[in-house]
């Protein structure tokens, strides 16, 4: 504050616009007000109107300088935060806490709820398996509809076919074992799958 008393209010006019503070705006308004009082000794109406316009401009100027200083302070705080974060990352890197990552590698934050959980290959395999299961479900549903409509007999035995061997002309009923008679309904429905 002592340096402030040593400086005259007119020095605020010599500063760069971006260096002005709110106190400088007050100094400028003081100088302009003092000069207007010297001129307005005669009570001239035009000078009085000009005085109100100047006060309004100074108020706008004060608001603008205040906003600029707040923005500047926010930027300084952000810069300090970034500098602190950079120092922390550098310190972690030098202490060996960070694994080195080569090209074509992705660093994933395990706490991020939107992180990728599967590789593309795993997703392709899951989708292919899903499509196969969908196809099997559709076949099973069609077969179930045939059973319900009576087209297929519910007592009709299903035969498993091995696609790698040459099929016999007609399977013998005596070759059906007791084990195949006890198959569950789901096993019967999916018995068309190749071995």
Curated annotation (Swiss-Prot):
Among InterPro entries, the record links this protein to:
DZIP_RILPL, RH1, RH2, RILP_dimer
UniProt similarity note: Belongs to the RILPL family.
Query: In Gene Ontology terms, what is a biological process of this protein?
Result: epithelial cell morphogenesis
Q: Where are its TM segments located?
A: none
Give the protein's recorded name.
RILP-like protein 2
Query: Is Transport given among the entry's keywords?
Result: yes
Q: Where does the record place a coiled coil?
A: 58-149
> What gene name does this entry carry?
rilpl2
Where it sits in the cell: the answer is: Cytoplasm, Cytosol; Cytoplasm, Cytoskeleton, Microtubule organizing center, Centrosome; Cell projection, Cilium
Q: What is its main location?
A: cytoplasm
């Amino acid at each position: 504050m002592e340096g402030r008393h040593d400086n005259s209010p007119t020095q605020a006019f010599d500063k760069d616009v971006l260096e002005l503070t709110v106190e400088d705006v007050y100094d400028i308004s003081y100088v302009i007000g003092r000069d207007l009082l010297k001129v307005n000794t005669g009570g001239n109406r035009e000078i009085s109107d000009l005085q109100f316009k100047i006060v309004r401009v100074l108020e706008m100027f004060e608001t603008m300088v205040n906003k600029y200083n707040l923005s500047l302070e926010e930027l300084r705080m952000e810069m300090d935060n970034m500098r602190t974060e950079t120092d922390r990352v550098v310190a972690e890197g030098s202490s060996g806490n960070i694994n080195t990552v080569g090209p074509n590698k992705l660093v994933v934050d395990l706490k991020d709820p939107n992180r990728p959980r599967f590789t593309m290959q795993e997703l392709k395999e899951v989708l292919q398996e899903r499509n196969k299961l969908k196809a099997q479900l559709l076949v099973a549903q069609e077969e179930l509809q045939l059973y319900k409509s009576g087209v297929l007999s519910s007592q009709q035995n299903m035969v498993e076919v091995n696609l790698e061997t040459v099929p016999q002309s007609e399977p013998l009923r005596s070759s059906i074992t007791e084990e195949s008679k006890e198959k569950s309904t789901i096993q019967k429905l999916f018995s068309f799958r190749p071995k």
